[in-house]
């Protein structure tokens, strides 16, 4: 409880007083309830009530003070850090990684200084990640490195990965690119060097004794080395809810630590001797595997459990967790926002709090085979259930069958672990014994892959929830608390009515699970919404009609890698969009379709792709159409004058709003060699809102459309043609549209000079308010207003 109070203090500083003080008041209320409802200890608790409340208040404000100290320390030097600033950094390497063709060295206990004579005073700073082309040092080395500052970027689109928040939560303030290690001191680092060599040798041995896919998974699971982890397997495990097995956590620490601890105890070693032997071993394993936050939590809890045995006491899981949470947050209060830490803590809370109330209250020896199986199932539910809101908060989707998959996966983990460890150790000596020893792990991992691929084919395997509003978290965890209280009451009243108790328990479990799942998956009704995504040099536009029909326009980029996987899909999932009814493609340039190709390959549901009739002969478009058909997506061809109607039905079952998309260009007789001259152009109408979307058409085509449609082009919103190029957005075109708002989608730095000053001046002269994705990030139109900086 004290750990929760301490956490509340940090939450108040990190996320706002409303959340932090609300959590604090909840903690105090729980303390009062415990003091006046726990019969066995009511008198003792009442006498200590004042002490509990006083300590809670002290911890709450101590946490706030600690957060402020750390935050002020960070601000004191980050205000002087700018991108590409030349600096010198001194620090100790705590972890090394090889990723995307370069080495990353994580430095702690850092000091830094500018390389210019005017700012070369040395000052303390937070942790730093150094990017190098070659492995110039090892873990444990104290180094001096020169380089240029790389500030981590914040997310500029809803759902996009926020690098700044991610690194900040781990205490890393900036990166050092083009880094060069000038000097290093290694005389006391022999221990770290030995562990790194052991890790590297074991990882290389796994590559020698088995295939690359299996070696990548085993290296991640056993050694914390994700350099060779197959992205397809990583995504597959995530979608099916078993990605936790890839991280070094309590499960892995338990397998290693408990195995040695029990072996020593069986051989007659005392509690103290076992503790003194296993503790250095488990600490060394933690350092070797990268010492992630979840690993620190697991190692700390395991050591506390062994220490309790040394003093003749029984270790308490929740108290150990609380102690480690306070230790971790004291060291780095920003860890409160780290996903791995949150998952780790919530999983243990599920085991320690929810599981005892989810399983039957029957002695193990009195349980039937069916009851044992039932308890295993509900134990899995109890662990997974509290984690679902956290999963939805981070991935905007939940794996429906995760409970069943984990029931089959977790019991086989020791087989993988033991087989992998022995195979990697033997492989360091000779390949043949390693190849034999790795076979059990190989076959179990193949079973995992087969199981996961089967599960994702089942209906509803992956439910897109969207970003959860605060009220859903409140309702979900309040519902879970009510369930625990209800079962507690049932257990008190069961006495001799065991049969009646079991029936009520089954009903309560099912009702609770169904209710909590409904809280997560039921989506509120939506209103019309337009989003122009920040995809760098490219286009990506989402629109939701009042009727609920959801469409997407283009989707590509030439400067942002994997724009479909990293920006478009996360945005759609963040907004709870399970499928796109119509995906419009203006033309087949890469900055308009690269992301769409990725979305198709991901298996995301698209009902129709809409292209211009005249685009059939375009080679790149033909390739896209072929890919669409491969994934079962229907392709619609439009020409000038064609209309796609969406109906909006009011409460009286009457169609009361015009919702349509009218194709303006090209017609069947139009033909130009340049793709830009043949862009699919259309007008979108949704009740009192309208918009013009014309891809990359030049001013000549704009003039042609003005002469054909005249005042029919008038619209509220205009997506600037060709990213605001010099030869688009002509004066006559803008006068015909007369837009209130104009969005320009382009990269901050591009070789085309977008947006051109001439185009910007013409748009401003037309009286339109301009929004730039390169400055504002994602641009959102909702409830008759435009919003910037959706971050």
Give names to the regions the model predicted:
Residues 56-244, 566, 570-573, 579, ...:
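Membrane-interface helix/helix-cap signal primarily in integral membrane proteins
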Residues 37, 231-402, 465-525, 703, ...:
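Hydrophobic alpha-helical transmembrane segments in multi-pass membrane proteins
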Residues 90, 113-116, 131-148, 165-167, ...:
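Non-globular, low-confidence helical/coil segments that flank catalytic cores
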Residues 4, 169-301, 306, 385, ...:
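Aromatic-rich juxtamembrane segments at the membrane interface
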Residues 12-22, 42-46, 339, 399-400, ...:
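Membrane-helix interface and helix-disruption motif detector
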Residues 1-77, 297, 490-493, 500:
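N-terminal leader/targeting segments
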Residues 191-210, 217, 225, 233, ...:
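Hydrophobic alpha-helical segments of integral membrane proteins
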């Amino acid at each position: 409880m004290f750990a929760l109070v301490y956490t509340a203090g940090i939450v108040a500083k990190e996320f706002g007083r409303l959340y932090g003080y609300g959590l604090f008041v909840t903690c105090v209320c729980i303390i009062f309830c415990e003091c006046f409802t726990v019969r066995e200890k009511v008198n003792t608790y009442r006498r200590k009530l004042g002490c509990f409340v006083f300590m809670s208040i002290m911890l709450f404000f101590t946490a706030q003070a600690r957060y402020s100290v750390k935050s002020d320390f960070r601000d004191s030097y980050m205000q002087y850090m700018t991108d590409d600033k030349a600096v010198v950094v001194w620090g100790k390497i705590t972890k090394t990684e090889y990723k995307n063709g370069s080495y990353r060295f994580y430095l702690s206990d850092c000091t830094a200084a500018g390389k210019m004579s005017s700012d070369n005073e040395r000052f303390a700073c937070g942790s730093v990640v150094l990017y190098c082309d070659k492995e110039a040092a090892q873990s444990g080395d104290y180094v001096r490195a020169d380089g240029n500052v790389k500030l981590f970027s914040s997310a500029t689109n809803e759902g996009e990965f926020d690098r700044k928040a991610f690194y900040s939560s781990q205490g890393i303030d900036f990166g050092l690119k083009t880094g060069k290690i000038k000097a290093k001191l290694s005389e006391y680092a022999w221990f770290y060097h030995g562990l790194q060599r052991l890790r590297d040798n074991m990882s290389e041995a796994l590559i020698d004794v088995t295939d690359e896919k299996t070696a990548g998974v085993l290296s991640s699971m056993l050694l914390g080395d994700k350099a060779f982890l197959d992205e397809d397997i990583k995504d597959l495990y995530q979608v099916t809810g078993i990605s936790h097995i890839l991280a070094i956590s309590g499960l892995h620490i338990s397998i290693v630590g408990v195995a040695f601890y029990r072996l020593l105890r069986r051989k007659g070693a005392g509690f103290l001797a076992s503790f003194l032997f296993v503790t250095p071993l488990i600490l060394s394993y933690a350092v070797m595997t990268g010492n992630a936050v979840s690993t620190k939590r697991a190692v700390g809890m395991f050591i506390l459990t062994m220490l309790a045995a040394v003093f003749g006491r029984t270790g308490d899981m929740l108290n150990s967790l609380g102690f480690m949470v306070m230790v971790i947050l004291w060291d780095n209060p920003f860890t409160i926002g780290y996903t791995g830490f949150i998952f780790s803590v919530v999983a243990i809370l599920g085991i320690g709090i929810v599981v005892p109330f989810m399983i039957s209250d029957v002695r193990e020896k009195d349980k039937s085979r069916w009851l044992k199986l039932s308890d295993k199932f509900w134990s899995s539910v109890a662990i997974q259930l509290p984690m679902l809101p956290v999963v939805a908060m981070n991935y905007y989707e939940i794996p429906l069958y995760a409970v069943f998959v984990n029931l089959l996966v977790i019991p086989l983990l020791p087989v993988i672990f033991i087989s992998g460890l022995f195979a990697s150790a033997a492989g360091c000596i000779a390949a043949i014994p390693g190849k034999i020893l790795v076979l059990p792990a190989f076959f179990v991992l193949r079973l995992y892959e087969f199981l996961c691929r089967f599960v994702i084919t089942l209906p509803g395997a992956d439910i897109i929830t969207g970003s959860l509003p605060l009220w859903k978290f409140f309702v979900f965890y309040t519902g879970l608390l009510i369930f625990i209280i209800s079962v507690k009451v049932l257990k008190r009243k069961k006495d001799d009515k065991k049969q009646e108790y079991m029936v009520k328990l089954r009903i309560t479990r099912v009702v609770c699970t169904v209710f909590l799942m409904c809280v997560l998956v039921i989506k509120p009704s939506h209103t019309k919404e337009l989003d122009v995504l920040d995809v760098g040099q490219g286009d990506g536009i989402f629109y939701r009609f009042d009727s609920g029909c959801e469409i997407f326009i283009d989707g590509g980029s030439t400067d942002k890698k994997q724009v479909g996987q990293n920006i478009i899909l996360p945005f759609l999932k963040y907004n709870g969009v399970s499928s796109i009814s119509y995906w419009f493609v203006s033309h087949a340039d890469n900055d308009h379709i690269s992301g769409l190709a990725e979305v198709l390959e991901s298996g995301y549901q698209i009902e129709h792709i809409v292209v211009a009739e005249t685009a059939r002969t375009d080679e790149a478009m033909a390739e896209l159409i072929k890919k669409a058909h491969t994934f079962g997506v229907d392709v619609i061809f439009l020409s000038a004058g064609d209309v796609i109607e969406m109906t909006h039905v009011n409460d009286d079952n009457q169609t009361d709003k015009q919702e349509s998309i009218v194709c303006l260009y090209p017609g069947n007789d139009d033909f130009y060699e340049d793709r830009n001259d043949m862009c699919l152009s259309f007008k979108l109408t949704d009740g009192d809102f309208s918009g013009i979307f014309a891809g990359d058409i030049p001013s000549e085509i704009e003039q042609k459309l003005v002469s054909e449609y005249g005042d029919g082009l008038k619209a509220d919103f205009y997506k600037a043609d060709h990213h605001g190029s010099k030869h688009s957005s002509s004066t006559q075109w803008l006068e015909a549209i007369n837009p209130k708002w104009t969005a320009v989608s382009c990269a901050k730095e591009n070789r085309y000079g977008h947006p051109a000053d001439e185009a910007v001046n013409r748009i401003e002269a037309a009286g339109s308010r301009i929004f730039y994705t390169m400055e504002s990030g994602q641009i959102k139109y909702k409830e008759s207003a435009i919003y910037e900086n959706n971050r």
